Curated annotation (Swiss-Prot):
<dbReference type="GO" id="GO:0062023">
    <property type="term" value="C:collagen-containing extracellular matrix"/>
</dbReference>
<comment type="subunit">
    <text>Homotetramer; disulfide-linked.</text>
</comment>
<feature type="disulfide bond">
    <location>
        <begin position="129"/>
        <end position="160"/>
    </location>
</feature>
<dbReference type="GO" id="GO:1901346">
    <property type="term" value="P:negative regulation of vasculature development involved in avascular cornea development in camera-type eye"/>
</dbReference>
<keyword id="KW-0732">Signal</keyword>
<dbReference type="GO" id="GO:0007596">
    <property type="term" value="P:blood coagulation"/>
</dbReference>
<comment type="function">
    <text>Has a role in the formation and organization of the extracellular matrix. In the eye, it functions as a mediator of dexamethasone-induced matrix deposition in the trabecular meshwork, the tissue responsible for the outflow of the ocular aqueous humor and for the maintenance of intraocular pressure. Is a negative regulator of angiogenesis in the cornea, and plays a major role in maintaining corneal avascularity and transparency.</text>
</comment>
<dbReference type="InterPro" id="IPR014716">
    <property type="entry name" value="Fibrinogen_a/b/g_C_1"/>
</dbReference>
<feature type="glycosylation site" description="N-linked (GlcNAc...) asparagine">
    <location>
        <position position="265"/>
    </location>
</feature>
<feature type="disulfide bond">
    <location>
        <begin position="283"/>
        <end position="296"/>
    </location>
</feature>
<dbReference type="InterPro" id="IPR002181">
    <property type="entry name" value="Fibrinogen_a/b/g_C_dom"/>
</dbReference>
<feature type="glycosylation site" description="N-linked (GlcNAc...) asparagine">
    <location>
        <position position="56"/>
    </location>
</feature>
<dbReference type="InterPro" id="IPR036056">
    <property type="entry name" value="Fibrinogen-like_C"/>
</dbReference>
<keyword id="KW-0325">Glycoprotein</keyword>
<feature type="signal peptide">
    <location>
        <begin position="1"/>
        <end position="26"/>
    </location>
</feature>
<dbReference type="GO" id="GO:0005615">
    <property type="term" value="C:extracellular space"/>
</dbReference>
<feature type="domain" description="Fibrinogen C-terminal">
    <location>
        <begin position="120"/>
        <end position="341"/>
    </location>
</feature>
Amino acid sequence: MLKKTLSAVAWLCIFLVAFVSHPVWPQKPPKRKTPAELTAATCCEEAKALQAQIANLSSLLSDLGKKQERDWVSVVMQVMELESSAKSMETRLTEAESKYSEMNNQIGIMQLQAAQTVTQTSADAIYDCSSLYQKNYRISGVYKLPPDDFLGSPELEVFCDMETSGGGWTIIQRRKSGLVSFYRDWKQYKQGFGSIRGDFWLGNDHIHRLSRRPTRLRVEMQDWEGNMRYAEYSHFVLGNELNSYRLFLGNYSGDVGNDALIYHNNTAFSTKDKDNDNCLDKCAQLRKGGYWYNCCTDSNLNGVYYRLGEHNKHLDGITWYGWHGSSYSLKRVEMKIRPEDFQP
């Protein structure tokens, strides 16, 4: 009996422990949403979706606006460049039309001048000292040749020899005092230098213009003993600057002995800053002048002026090998030209 009672108590204790550890209470059933609440939830989700779409559209519109602004700026810049190019082309066209008109005017003037020149006789125009001689200017001295717009020559001061061998000579070079250095550069020989009444070089540009028609060259020399000699050439031409003022000579005549200028025939002009000679050495620097150096000289009429006592000790003096050799520097030299058809 006691065993049954104890067994019942044990089972009761086990039940109580199990109940306390895992109580079982009655639960309420879940509350269902009303139709209004379901509708509100659906609207919120749609609103959020619309807000997202609006944000995306705003971003797209912003990007499109920026791109449109950039495209507009680019279009404006292109329009401005086109307008600038159009103005530039218009300016160029205007300048071209102006130059064309000016050229037509110049051609008209030149044609008129040419027509007037054809009707003139040689006595009407003054080209050089021979023209002055034909106009009865018979006194040797300084004259001014008027400018010639048709030939492009400016007014030119020259020294005319109206006495020697019939007169009419235009002097292009003189050495007599030694007061002017002839060791000059290309530009100075091109333009001319010195004193027209003393030592001078007329200028290669001027000499070129004066020798464009058939011209005779005369070279007169004097030594320190007072002896006089001359050399003449039936045909003298000086090329233009593009041709390096190349020298061309015809037949020689005179009493100076051997022709010492023919060695320089068909030779370009050289100066200390422009070496056009036919030698490895720079002859203009060796001979201290500007001249038609070949390789190097048989004459050096633009060399250093040495006075008596020093005149026979140097190779860079004013020399004419055919008379006194290579180391004798002359006392006086003149180079002069006149037309071949000149008649006193």
